[in-house]
Regions:
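Periplasmic-binding protein-like
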Residues: 305-350, 397-398, 510-515
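N-terminal lobe/hinge region of extracytoplasmic solute-binding protein
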Residues: 4-10, 27-83, 201-203
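Aromatic- and charge-enriched surface segment that lines or borders ligand/interaction sites
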Residues: 76-132, 166, 256, 308-310
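Structural transition elements
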Residues: 208, 322, 335-377, 395-397
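Long beta-strand-rich cores associated with HINT superfamily self-processing modules
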Residues: 526-553
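Gly/Pro-rich hinge or "lid" segments in bacterial periplasmic/extracellular proteins
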Residues: 60-65, 138-147, 151-158, 162-164, ...
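Extracytoplasmic/peripheral linker and loop segments enriched in polar/acidic and small residues
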Residues: 2, 11-17, 157-158, 316, ...
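Extracellular/periplasmic solute-recognition and catalytic clefts
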Residues: 211-222, 243-306
Length: 553
């Protein structure tokens, strides 16, 4: 694509402006996974959280490499550690208030962290903090089941005064500032907490609060009158309202964004294949489109807990039978869809090493002879039946292409389309559902929780991060002591070169299990309304940073 305005928002701010007012009109085919900062994991839900909630740290509001930095948000400075990452100290800003006027203090941040431990009540969000802060000899059950005298809470987090936080970790962790940029560090007042019901009306500490929420239909955010711009170094808060329309089909979303009825597709998975072709042929549409490298991996998860995938030969048969070229074309091809992937770590991370454990033949269309040999080794020369889980839109196209390519060797995959909003909480992300519904294969994707190898790979393959209660992303429930040990070794390696080499080993060790079929290192084609201002693709999320956007029309 040669249009000079195409991809303009990938590296710079398009239409910079300080104009305030108006309504930012967003649209999505699916509802948020949760409005509770402890329970959300969808990347676009995190971008909404940036408008509603303050966190201890936050990704910088910048395009390009600068946006990958985490900067102080509620904190006045990055965390300090006197002992190499074992203890972390933060001082919080004064003058920050919840929407009801209550001051935000360290106690409410500590309580927010404690809520993460209540996985029986609040599953769904990231759980790094549990592994770093919990005492295995005396596990903390979360604030709802803390029966100890005086309910002392999580002892590993101290609040010596209202504006000081001290975290005492079980092991050194150099990336702790990144964890403090996740929604799980957004403060929650204990008196406002309603447990599982908090997601219906969380209390805002950021520039916008909920004005109206009709699940599956509409979310309207209005200004938070208690927000003080002078205390917030991250957020622009230009529009008076942010209005999110929910529940259109992916094709309806495309049509109405292209027609100018909405400003962007909040979900951010990119336009459908028909719209890609339309944009490519229309210079006016191309000039307001962006096709960033997202650092996401599009992949097929293969579940060993669902027979016959408990046999590695059946898993390998899927790898060899898959038509990699057709799967890439289902994502939009090499122009808009991304690049063929062989390993797990995307090229933007130092641990990436080109590696193809299961070659797909000279034309990339699959090695059917090797696939049949693997089926024979499993004692299933005629193939078998299974279910492939997916969502609507491009995920469905991928599932259909996968099923067609596997059928060439006798693997009969029935496509099951699951609800998008609950896909990772109660569908593919709930181990019991995977077993009950026999979801042997699943179409999914993953981007790093933060831009390091640990932030990318650990949730997918570290057995200690499996979440039986939902919100699980280690879909294969891989718990290999060697993989876990390599992860720990990589985290404690002394030099960047050592770390990168060890992460490459993790990648290879996981591929030996054949539980992940990498498809595409992702590119996503986004479209923006010409009436929006301050628009850029945030490099940490791969989507437009809605907290920065304004409107001028």
């Amino acid at each position: 694509m040669t249009d000079p305005l195409f991809n303009a928002a990938c590296a710079a701010v398009v239409r910079p402006s300080g104009q305030r007012g108006g309504v930012l009109r967003l649209v999505t085919s699916a509802d948020v996974d949760s409005l509770d900062p402890a329970r959300t994991y969808y990347v676009w839900s995190w971008l909404l959280q940036r408008t509603m909630q303050r966190t201890v740290m936050a990704f910088a509001a910048s395009p390009g490499p600068a946006g990958l930095r985490v900067v102080p948000d509620l904190a006045v400075a990055p965390g300090s550690t006197p002992d190499g990452g074992l203890t972390w100290h933060y001082t919080l800003r004064r003058g920050v208030r919840f929407e009801d006027g209550t001051p935000v203090t360290a106690h409410q941040v500590k309580y927010a962290v404690e809520r993460v431990f209540a996985q029986d009540v609040l599953p769904g969000g990231p759980t790094y903090l549990i592994g770093l802060l919990d005492d295995p000899a005396d596990p903390y059950p979360g604030p709802y089941r803390d029966a100890r005298p005086g309910r002392p809470g999580l002892r590993a987090v101290e609040t010596p005064d209202p504006y000081t936080l001290v975290f005492r970790l079980r092991r050194p962790f150099a990336d702790f500032d990144y964890l403090m940029a996740q929604p799980t560090s957004a403060p929650v007042p204990p008196g406002a907490d309603t447990g599982a019901g908090y997601e219906r009306r969380p209390l805002a500490s950021g520039p916008y609060r909920i004005g109206e929420y009709r699940p599956g239909r509409r979310l309207r955010l209005v200004r938070n009158p208690a927000w003080d711009r002078s205390t917030d170094p991250v957020r622009s808060a230009l529009p008076d309202e942010i209005d999110v329309t929910v529940g259109l089909t992916p094709h309806e979303v495309d049509a109405r964004v292209l027609a100018g009825e909405f400003d962007i597709n909040l979900e951010g998975r990119g336009v459908q294949l028909e719209s890609q072709r339309r944009i490519a042929a229309d210079p006016a549409l191309l000039a307001r489109s962006d096709n960033p490298v997202t650092n996401f991996l599009q992949y097929i998860s293969i579940q060993p807990q669902v027979p016959p995938f408990d046999d590695v030969h059946c898993r390998r048969a899927v790898h060899y039978a898959a038509d990699r070229v057709a799967l890439l074309e289902a994502r939009g091809g090499g122009v808009f869809g991304g690049d063929l992937a062989a390993g797990l770590l995307p090229p933007g991370l130092p641990g990436h090493r080109p590696y193809d454990r299961y070659p797909a033949g000279p034309d990339g269309r699959g090695d059917l002879a090797r696939a049949r040999a693997e089926l024979a080794a499993a004692g299933l020369p005629d193939g078998f039946e299974t279910v492939v889980a997916t969502q609507r839109g491009k995920f469905r196209v991928v599932a259909d292409v996968l099923a067609h390519s596997l059928a060439r060797v006798g693997i009969r995959a029935r496509v099951a389309e699951l609800d998008i909003a609950g896909y990772y909480r109660t569908g593919l992300g709930l181990p019991a559902t995977v077993r009950e519904r026999g979801l042997g294969l699943a179409v999914t994707d993953w981007g790093p929780d933060y831009p390091t190898e640990y932030g990318f790979l650990a949730p997918l393959v570290d057995g200690r991060l499996i979440k039986p209660g939902g919100g699980n992303h280690n879909f294969a429930e891989l718990d290999d002591p060697r993989v876990n040990a390599l992860i720990d070794a990589a985290q404690s390696a002394g030099t960047a070169q050592e770390r990168a080499g060890l992460w490459a080993e993790v990648d290879r060790a996981v591929m030996e299990h054949a539980v992940i079929l990498p498809m595409v290192y992702d590119r996503t084609l986004h479209v923006r309304n010409p009436g929006v201002t301050n628009v850029y693709v945030h490099p940490a999320f791969g989507l437009y940073d809605i907290q920065a956007m304004g409107v001028a029309r």
